[in-house]
Amino acid sequence: MGVHDGHRERRRALFRRCGEDAFADHELLEVLLFYAIPRKDTNPIAHALIDQFGSLQAVLAASPEELESVPEVGPSASTLIALVSALSRKALTSAASGEVVLDTRAR
């Protein structure tokens, strides 16, 4: 067993226990990338994204094409990041408008 065995599960468990405050920005991005990049160390990729774009906010604002300019970021990772960003914007917009959706079929 290597030192990195179980790393992903430990990171997921820490997030479930403690939330985002237990993580630096690149660490949150690293955990997100677990779901799009199953067999690579996502820590250096997360660092590369933050380094290229300057901040987590800028990473989330980047287009999939811009994200894919970072080595090892392919369509799955860029789509996941763009999807998380879109979901966040949609939720914030709904919260700001005071809109409450009880039944999505009613729209």
Give the residues covered by each predicted segment.
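A short amphipathic alpha-helix within small helical-bundle interaction modules
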Residues: E20, L49, L56-P71
